[in-house]
Amino acid sequence: MTPRALLSLALAVGFAGCSQPGVRHTSGSKLVFSGLAGEPDSLNPMLSNEADTLNFSHLYMSYLVENDDRNDTIPEIAQQVPTLANGGISRDQLTVTYHIRRNVRWQDGAPLTALDVVFSYHAIVNPRNNVATRVGYAEVGAIRAVGNDTVVVRLRRRFSPFVQYFFGPQGVGAIMPAHLLEGHADLNRVAYNARPVGAGPFQIVRWTRGDSITLAANPLYWRGKPRIDRLVYRIIPDPNTRLEQLRSGEVDAYFDVDPQLLPQVRSIPGVHIALTPVNDLHLLRFNLRDPALGDVNVRRAIAMSIDRQTLLSAATHGSGVLIDADQPSNGWAYNASLSPIRYDPAGAKRLL
């Protein structure tokens, strides 16, 4: 039996405009978020192992590729996602070529080029830097910039998820500005880590430790300046405090709400709730070396004996989705045609 999964849903109270009653956010406005559960260890994603920082960094840093809301890989700083079909991946699958957009500038006005990508790669694999993981980058045998807008990577061996890891959504580290960071033996303690210069839609203005991080719209952003002038991310570890600040209007939006607090959030007048799928799976894994569990009928009987829907409803207050695979239900890899195993204790007994 395929391991069963419960897909919980995150609560995102409106990056696109959820607010307290009577508040309208238009161009030139400021949004205050309860977006960080703890103090970041660094604002440089290369040196961070915290989910908050890695997710938050996409606001001010840039990557070669990113994922859309269906988990499809799409280009960001790269002009296109390298594939066999478009020639970005060689027939032997050992050479990957990226063509960099020519209209991208760092937040200080300098152009972002292929040399920045090569520099950032060398920073990640530098053993002196305290990088959490080098998965994907460790597979690189050689890398070179061809002019200002082409990066050619040669792999040591075939590594199918390489494009997802190399300055992509699964990897560690964003593209960093060589002109600001060259010459350091390591990057562990440079001032850049507290106020990075990136190429994302917003730029870091101020980090008030223990309180908040303030970002301003980047007027040089290659997709155009964001319509929201300023974002303030409050650092609020206690979920109940986050809830009360949403209720009082001290914050405009609240991400990743604990499902146990969902009934209280729903009771706040004027608050819009957006439920978005996240890859948060709860499942049982079977030890197939066990003689009993090696029998598919035993595994199926166990699955049929668990009332997953009741568990899911109780745990998520109706915000979860029951799925029958180990992939998010909105992703390209999810197989919606799988026949669900339904709760059936009597049927389970007949299998044994």
Question: What label would you give each PLM region?
Answer:
Residues 16-17:
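C-terminal motif of bacterial Sec signal peptides marking the signal peptidase cleavage site
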Residues 28-38, 79, 94-98, 120, ...:
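Short, well-ordered beta-strand elements
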Residues 34-90, 122, 195-199:
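N-terminal lobe/hinge region of extracytoplasmic solute-binding protein
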Residues 68-70, 169-226, 230, 240, ...:
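Gly/Pro-rich hinge or "lid" segments in bacterial periplasmic/extracellular proteins
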Residues 81-130, 146, 152-154, 245, ...:
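Aromatic- and charge-enriched surface segment that lines or borders ligand/interaction sites
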Residues 134-182, 206:
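Surface-exposed binding/hinge segments that line
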Residues 190, 218-264, 300:
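Ligand-site clamp/hinge motif
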Residues 214-219, 294-352:
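Append "and occasionally in soluble cytosolic enzymes with long acidic Gly/Pro-rich linkers
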